[in-house]
Amino acid sequence: MKVSIIVPVYNEEKTICKVLSRLQKLGKQDFSYEIIVVDDGSTDTSVLEIKKSKLQIPKLKVVSHRKNKGKGMAVRTGIKHATGDYVVIQDADLEYDPQDIPRLVKALGVAGVDVVYGTRLDRLPNLHRDERVPLFLLHFLGNRFLSLVTSILYGQWLTDMETCYKLFPRKALTNIRLEAKGFEFEPEITAKLLKKGSHIYEIPIKTNPRGYDDGKKLDTTRDGVRALWTLIKYRIYD
């Protein structure tokens, strides 16, 4: 089995090399894997950092957008270049630990499972600084609400619909037309996978939450409203 690890990047000059290094350190696994980096029109030195990493990881696939198009578009571009049996998304910051990827793959062995999500929301987030508490609690509660809406609308219980760590079969996208350009990619692909009959299995993962001072780009209120509308829209339409 081969897994395509897609890494969308937008202005992550401080972390992208570390993330790619951690992915490389996955080493030999029970599955083969490829790493596909999609630079989404970064305006900082992310491209230079990616080039440095490619010197250390010759098989690294790099695709670039001339202009910023959004995370959803970056992931869709990565999927077009993927050759694996399964696809998993890895954010370019240090919030998600690549060491959890083998655990996601292992979970495919559970009977009837074809899609695996890594859930952060079976517990309160790991908060490091007092001033972050209101922000992360808002984000946590917003995600729980959206996950509850997903569960009600699509008939399968999920605790973390918005998680970055989504492992799904590439062939499952053959009959799915993805349209999202931004962060609404998360609810769109979840909605469409569930409507096609996929069973999503969740496993707990550890994360290191970051704030806007660390480069976080998600707007909890704006993107939360868009996610809610996306879930409702695809419940009604294909």
Segments the model singles out, each with a brief description of its role:
Residues 7-21, 41:
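Active-site beta-to-alpha loop of glycosyltransferases that engages the nucleotide-sugar donor
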Residues 1-3, 129, 153-156, 178-238:
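Hydrophobic helical membrane-anchoring modules
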Residues 39-48, 94:
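A conserved acidic beta->alpha catalytic loop
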Residues 21-32:
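Short, acidic, metal-binding catalytic loop of nucleotide-sugar glycosyltransferases
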Residues 65-81, 86, 99-183, 209-218:
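Acceptor/aglycone-binding surface of glycosyltransferases and processive sugar-polymer synthases
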Residues 33-36, 47-81:
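Conserved donor nucleotide-binding strand/loop of the catalytic core
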Residues 85-93:
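Short beta-strand-to-loop acidic/aromatic patch adjacent to the donor-nucleotide binding site
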Residues 19, 46, 75, 99-101, ...:
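Acidic donor-diphosphate engagement hotspot in glycosyltransferases and nucleotidyltransferases
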